[in-house]
C-alpha cells in the first residue's frame, strides 16, 4: 500500500513471486494509493525498508529469485508513482510474451542438447535400426520433432511481438480506438500462443528421452531441467484460463481482461 506520512509517500506491504528482484537495482511494485486507485511504484532494491528474500524453492526456474519481498515504510519519490491506467496499455501482453519467448529458448536448448548427445553416443540397442544411434531413422525422427517444436514456438513468439508492435504504434499515434483494438488483439494472440507453446515445449521436454538411453536420466546430465523449467513457466498463469478467454472472445466477443492478478478469496 502507498500512503502519505508527514507529507511524504511511503510504500508498505509484502509480496511473493518477485522474479528477478534479487538481481535488480530497481523494482516496479503494484500498490493501492489512499484513494484505492491502483498505482505503479518504482523503488530501489537497496532503499531503506526493502528486503528481498531468496526463498524461492520451486522445482523449476530455480535461479529466477521468484521469492518474497517486504516493503516496510519505504520512502517513495512522487515522480516514481504513476496510475496503473496511465502505463502503456499493452504491458500485460508484453510481460506475458516474455514467458512465450522463454519457453522458446527452453525448446531450442533441449533440441540442441539432445542432438549433441545423439551425435556423440556410441552405444546402441540390439532392436535399433543402425549400428550407430546417430544413423537410426527413428531416433533422428525424434530429434527432428524436437527441433520442429522449437521452431514453431519461435515463429509463434515472433508473431506475438508483431502484435505488440502494432499496439505500440497505436500508442505512439495517440489513437484511442486503434489502441484499444490493438491491445485486445495482442492480449488474445499472446493467450493463444501460450496454450500451444506450453504444450509443444512440455511435450518436447519429455520426448527428448526417447532419443537417448536410460543413462540420460542420470542426475549429473540434468536433462530433467528442461521439463521442470517449462512446467514451472506454464504454471505461472494457468493456460486453461487463457483458452477459456480466447474461446469467450471467439464465441461471445468478450474482450480479454486488462490485467492479470493473483489474490485470495
Task: Describe the predicted segments one by one.
Residues 106, 113, 145, 149-152, ...:
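Charged, amphipathic alpha-helical oligomerization/scaffolding segments
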Residues 17-51:
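A short core secondary-structure module
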Residues 1-22:
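Glycine-rich flavin
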Residues 152-196, 206-214:
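C-terminal helix-coil-helix/basic helical segment that borders enzyme active sites and/or dimer interfaces
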Residues 210-265:
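Glycine-rich phosphate/cofactor-binding loops in nucleotide/flavin-utilizing enzymes
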Residues 17-21, 95-98, 233:
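Glycine-rich phosphate/pyrophosphate-binding beta-alpha loops
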Residues 58-154:
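Glycine-rich beta->alpha junctions and the first turn(s) of the following alpha-helix
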Residues 112, 116-119, 155-158, 162, ...:
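Charged/polar positions within long, soluble alpha-helices
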Amino acid at each position: 500500500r502507498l500512503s502519505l506520512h508527514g507529507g511524504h509517500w511511503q510504500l508498505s506491504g509484502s509480496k511473493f513471486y518477485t522474479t528477478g528482484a534479487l538481481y535488480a537495482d530497481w523494482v516496479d511494485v503494484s500498490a493501492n494509493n489512499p484513494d484505492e486507485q491502483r498505482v505503479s511504484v518504482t523503488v530501489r532494491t537497496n532503499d531503506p525498508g526493502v528486503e528481498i528474500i531468496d526463498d524461492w524453492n520451486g522445482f523449476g526456474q530455480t535461479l529466477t529469485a521468484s521469492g518474497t519481498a517486504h516493503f516496510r515504510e519505504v520512502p517513495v519519490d512522487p515522480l516514481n508513482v504513476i496510475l496503473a491506467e496511465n502505463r502503456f496499455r499493452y504491458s500485460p501482453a508484453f510481460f506475458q510474451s516474455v514467458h512465450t519467448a522463454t519457453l522458446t529458448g527452453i525448446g531450442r536448448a533441449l533440441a540442441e542438447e539432445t542432438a549433441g548427445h545423439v551425435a556423440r553416443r556410441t552405444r546402441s540397442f540390439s532392436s535399433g535400426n543402425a549400428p550407430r544411434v546417430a544413423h537410426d531413422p527413428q531416433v533422428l525422427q525424434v530429434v527432428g520433432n524436437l527441433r520442429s517444436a522449437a521452431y514453431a514456438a519461435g515463429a509463434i513468439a515472433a508473431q506475438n511481438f508483431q502484435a505488440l508492435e502494432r499496439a505500440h504504434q497505436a500508442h505512439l499515434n495517440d489513437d484511442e480506438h486503434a489502441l484499444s483494438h490493438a491491445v485486445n488483439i495482442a492480449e488474445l494472440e499472446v493467450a493463444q500462443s501460450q496454450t500451444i507453446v506450453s504444450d509443444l515445449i512440455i511435450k518436447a521436454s519429455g520426448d527428448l528421452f526417447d532419443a537417448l538411453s536410460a543413462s540420460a536420466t542420470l542426475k549429473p546430465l540434468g536433462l530433467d531441467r528442461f521439463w521442470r523449467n517449462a512446467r514451472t513457466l506454464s504454471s505461472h498463469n494457468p493456460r486453461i484460463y487463457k483458452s477459456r478467454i480466447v474461446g469467450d472472445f471467439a464465441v461471445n466477443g468478450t474482450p480479454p481482461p486488462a490485467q492479470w492478478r493473483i489474490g485470495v478469496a
